[in-house]
Structures are given as C-alpha cells and as structure tokens.
C-alpha cells in the first residue's frame, strides 16, 4: 500500500484502474492481484508544476502543485477507506511512505508518511540506506525533527544495503538507541544488482521479460 505515489509509469489492473508501477510489482511479489486500493492516489506529472490526479484508478483532473496542496486534504477519507478495506481482507498490509518522513516543510497535509501512521494506528519503521553514507546522522536527525505525536509512531529503525560484515557497525546501533530511544530492529545486506524496476521508474532500455 502506498497512499500517494508520483510516477508517469502507471500499470493497469484487471478492472482497468491505474496504479503506480511500483505498487503493481509489489503486489505481484506478494502473490496477490494488484488493485486500485493499493495506491489510491497517483500523481502523473504533466509539467514541472502540475500533475494529473488519479483517484482510485480513475483520472480526476489536472492540478497545479498549489491546487493539489489545497485539494489533498479532501483525499484523507479516500486513503483511509482504501487502507481499511485492505486491512479487512489481508492478514498483513505493508504501507510504504514517500521520501523522508521528516520534511518539516511538507508535514502539513502529508497523507503518505507518519501522519497516515498516526491516523490509522500503524507502527512505523524508518529505513536508512547505509550505502549512501551518513545513515546514523540521517536516522537520528529524522527522529529529532519529528513532532512528539509523530515520533511516537516510530517503533524502530532498519539499516538497508550494508556491504560487508554487520559486526563492523560495532556498538553504533545501541548508541543510536541510547540517544533517541528507538531500537535498530534489523540490518539488511546489499544485494548487488537486483533485476526489479526502480521505484517510480520503468526501465525502458530493458527488453520485456
């Protein structure tokens, strides 16, 4: 589930609904049929400052960024109803955020990250990419920037894309928990080349499988 995605590369479900290609791939990986509720709001950019807004798989108009910022408050019921329906029908629903959960200039009206976790009563994990460098500063800074009500939704960190021996992290994860009160629940290895389309982009230079 991803409440809102921005991508030109939509996929079409069996009933003709458009959802983000990434959510379509994720559904197939989970062994379930992709459906509109898995990506209730899809933004398909038409220019640098405007997007076609697709709601529950159907186009609903083209809005500028400023117009969408105002309009998206009305999409909360759509998002929450879609998520509730999935939770009723599936044992586990994994919700993906977008970008950073601590973009403090965007928290007002954010319907895809921790405000969604708060509204739906979801425990949240913050995933940091150690391959990019600065993962501990990034995780600590994320929690430090969050208001108290959103910080309370964060139950743990996951460190992703580690190259080499996890023992090289030493006591850093424990130190991070002492500093901010959030445990590191897992460290995932770098898998090298993975033949899956990048999020929000379709590999157009690759022949179809």
Model-identified regions with their sequence ranges:
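Flexible phosphate-sensing "switch/lid" loops adjacent to ATP/NTP-binding sites
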Residues: 1-209
